[in-house]
């Protein structure tokens, strides 16, 4: 409650994270105070690992939408262009983190930009 109050005080959107394993009643409570968007975790485990099945994510998106009109973004386990394309069918947006960090570790700006463009190409 203190965190929510402080975020509201400073006009900061506290992004709510929901996993495919989060029980429905917990989802309902989590999205009640959500601002900005809902971050749906597309994998179980650490970031950058394999995503769960698309059908499971679709079901979870439907469940979340039954409680909120906020946009739903999918992240965790989004590794390449194919993942981005699949997730855009499921959710309002896609969050790519680890794959972009890996691109930056290569150090060559031209390669970085090419790799990032490859991830997001239509």
Regions found by a protein language model. Give the residues of each.
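Catalytic cores of alpha/beta
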Residues: 22-32, 74, 78-94
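Short beta-strand/loop segments at the ligand-binding rim of alpha/beta enzyme cores
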Residues: 7-17, 65-75
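Glycine- and other small-residue-rich loops at beta-strand/loop junctions that grip anionic moieties
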Residues: 15-19, 49, 53, 76
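Glycine-rich phosphate-binding active-site loops on the catalytic face of alpha/beta enzymes
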Residues: 40-48, 77-78, 90-109
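Extended, intrinsically disordered, low-complexity segments
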Residues: 20-21, 114-122
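Glycine-enriched alpha-helix->loop->beta-strand junction motifs that scaffold or abut catalytic
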Residues: 6-15, 32-38, 89-93
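Hydrophobic positions in alpha-helices of CheY-like receiver
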Residues: 7, 64, 87, 116-119
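Active-site-adjacent beta->alpha loops and helix N-cap segments on the catalytic face
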Residues: 1-9, 23-29, 47-62, 81-84, ...
